[in-house]
Amino acid sequence: MRKPMMASVALAVSLVLSGCSTLEPRSTEVAPAIPSQWPAAVTAGAPATSTAEVADIGWRDFFVDPRLQAVITQSLENNRDLRVAVLNVERARAQYRIQRADRVPAVGVQGQMTRSGGDAPVTEQFSANLGVVEFELDLFGRVRNLSQAALQQYFAEAANRRSAQLSLVAEVANAWLTLGADSEQLRIAQATLATYEDSLRLTEARRELGGASALELSQTRTLVETARTDVARFAGQVAQDRNALVLLAGGPVDATLLPQAEVTEVASVRPLPAGMPGDVLLRRPDVMAAEHVLLSANANIGAARAAFFPSISLTGSIGSASSELSGLFDSGTRVWSFIPKLNLPIFQGGKLRANLGMATADRDIALAQYERAIQSGFREAADALALNESLDAQLSSQQALVAAAEQAQRLSQARYDAGLDSFLTLLDARRTAYTARQSLVSTQLAQQSNQVALYKVLGGGWHERG
C-alpha cells in the first residue's frame, strides 16, 4: 500500500513543481515615435470632446439612419470576409485549448487481455489500469510559454475580428453614402438634360424663324450632349455602387433600404480631438492585435530557450492484473507502475539555436509591426481630423457658391429674354450653376465619408446597443 501511495505523492509533487519557472524575456517596452499631442492644425478651434470616447460609441449610435443600420446589420450577418475572421477566432480558441491541455496530466483507463503460448500451455493475462502517460514537468516554463503564446494569438485573432468588423461597418457606410451621392448626381444630370432639351427645342424653333444663329443652335446642342453623357456616366456608376453594396452586404439589399437621390447626414456625433494620441490609438483593434502578436512572439522565445534544458516526463498507472477475468478485481491483484523519463539535449545539429534565433526574429518582426501600426494609426487619425475642419469650410463655401450661381443663372436668363445679354453669357451661367451643384454633392459626400473615416481610425466602437 505504501508504494502506490508514494507514487501518487510523487505525481502530486510533480504538478506543484510544474511551471515553477519561465525563461520568457521581459516584455519589450515600446515607445513609438509619435507626438504626444495632435498637430496644432488639427486641434485649432476644436471643442473639448475627448477622442477616447469614440471607442465606446456603438455603430448604431453613430449611424442614425435606420436604412443604413439595416444594411450594416445584414452585412455583419452575411459578409464572407467577416465570416472568415470569426472562424479564425474559433480556430485560435481551439488551438489555445489544445496547448493549455498539455499543462495538466492526461488521465486514461486501459484494459488489456494477453494470450500467449508455445510448447507450454496457453496462458492468459487480464489487466485494467488508470494512469497518466508522458506528463511533462514544466520546470523551465516551456509548456506554459507555449500555452501563453497560443492565448495571445487567440486574443490577436479576436482583435482582428473586431478590426474586420469595424472596417466592414465603415465600408458599408461609405458604399451606401456613395450610392446616395451618385444617385443625386444622376438626378441633377437628368433634370439638367431635360432643361437643356427644352432650350434646344426653343432654339430650333427660333432658328427656323430667323431669331437664332447657327452658333447658338450648335452651342445648345453641345450642352444637351454634355448632359446626356453625364446621365449615362452616372447611371453606370449607380449600377456599380449597387453591386458593391450587394457584395459587402453578402446578398441582395431590399430596395427600400437603398438611399435615393440624396446625401444623408448619417453621423450624429462629431468626435473632435482633445485626448492624448496614445490613449486613442491603443484602443484601435488593429493596434491591440499587433500588441498581442508581439506578446505571443515573446512567449515563444521562452519556449525556445526552455528547449535547451533537460525535460522530465512522468508515466504512472495503478490497477489490477489477473490470469482470470473473473478475478481481475479480487484482493491481491493490484499492480502499479511509476516511470520517470529524463530527456537531456546534447547534440541537435544546431536545431535548438536556430529555433531560438527564429523565435527572436519573429519577436523583432512583431515589434516593428506593432510600432508601424501605432505610427500608421496616428497618421490616419491626424489626416482625418485635419480634413474634418477643412471639409466643413469647403461645404459652407460650396453651398454659398451654388446659391450665387443659381441666382446668376436666373438673372442671366431674364436679361437674355429681355435682349440685354448674349446667348454666350447665358450658356456660361448655366454651365457654372450645373458644375456648382455637382461639386456640392461631391463635397457633401467627402465630408460624410471623412466622418466615417474618423470614426474608424479613432477606433470607433464595434458594439451595438440592444
Feature locations, PLM:
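Terminal intrinsically disordered/low-complexity segments used for targeting and assembly
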Residues: 2-77, 148-151, 235-282, 288, ...
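Periplasmic alpha-helical coiled-coil/stalk elements that build and connect Gram-negative outer-membrane
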Residues: 3, 21, 143, 159-276, ...
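Residues within alpha-helical transmembrane segments of multi-pass membrane proteins, especially transporters
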Residues: 12-16, 103, 343, 371, ...
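Small/polar-residue-enriched beta-strand and adjacent coil segments characteristic
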Residues: 22, 57-58, 66-67, 71-74, ...
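Charged, alpha-helical scaffolding/interaction elements associated with membrane systems
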Residues: 78-79, 209, 418
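Amphipathic alpha-helical coiled-coil segments
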Residues: 84-99, 164, 170-191, 195-198, ...
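Short coil/turn motifs that cap or connect alpha-helices
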Residues: 213, 252, 421-422, 461
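Phosphate-coordinating loops and pocket residues in cytosolic domains that bind phosphorylated ligands
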Residues: 219, 282-283, 428
